[in-house]
Amino acid sequence: IVKFDHAANGFRDCIRDNARIKAADVHLTVEEMIALCGGTILPDAYQPPADSSPRDLAGLWDVVSEAPRDWNRWIMQLREFESRSDSQMQVFLPLAHLRGGISDFDRKEENIRSLLDKLQRKGVVDDRSSAAALEYTYNSRLLRFCTEKAGNVLEVKTLLEGRWVQQKDVPYFGDCQMSVSIDWDGIVHDPGERIPETRNEIDVILMHGTVPLFISCKNGNIGEEELYKLHTVAERFGGPYAKKMLIATELDRKSPAANRA
């Protein structure tokens, strides 16, 4: 039986006279760390398959990194079109059925065709579109997830890079999680109870032994409110030695957030 000693940021053996356990001998999961600090993680967040690697995103990342701001706009338009498809993996969109329901249709269609061409060349989709319809298939569930929201691809890339960091041929981070939604009091109430909940989502959390690394990912610039959220959550659920990291595809070094970071 062990207990977590917040003052010492370590563990003590409750059976052996509170003897301190070496940090190297203790490895916590993200869920265990949050639970020890009084919170709980909401279930069902998507996690990439265990055998995924950064190479799986190489082509897609080329498209995103070339034009991060354009990517945000493209994904908003893509989702507007794809929301009208019965399947989200094998997309089929007859244009005659869409034209009357989407504003500025011609410009958006042109943008999407241009994007699909880029994704086709990078191996993200199999594009079979014609003049009458947009028709394409995502080449994996992981790649499909990365286009559901503009920021997903940066989160996934960060997570996969973390999984592959090694020290002496051993994974440096023992547990890696993304889209971690934390309930602050550890009690998940039924929505019908109408009890106010305090929750925050952290893009990526990596665990090295008992030390968590809280990461905020932004496909674009970072506002000061993101700095505040990251600091607050890490301080509450990470202990005194928690580490924090901001990752942004475009960071204005003159912005207040950049100066504070």
Set out the residue ranges of the language-model regions.
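Acidic, Ser/Thr-rich peripheral helices and adjacent loops at domain boundaries
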Residues: A24-E32
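Nuclease catalytic cores that cleave nucleic-acid phosphodiester bonds
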Residues: I1-I21
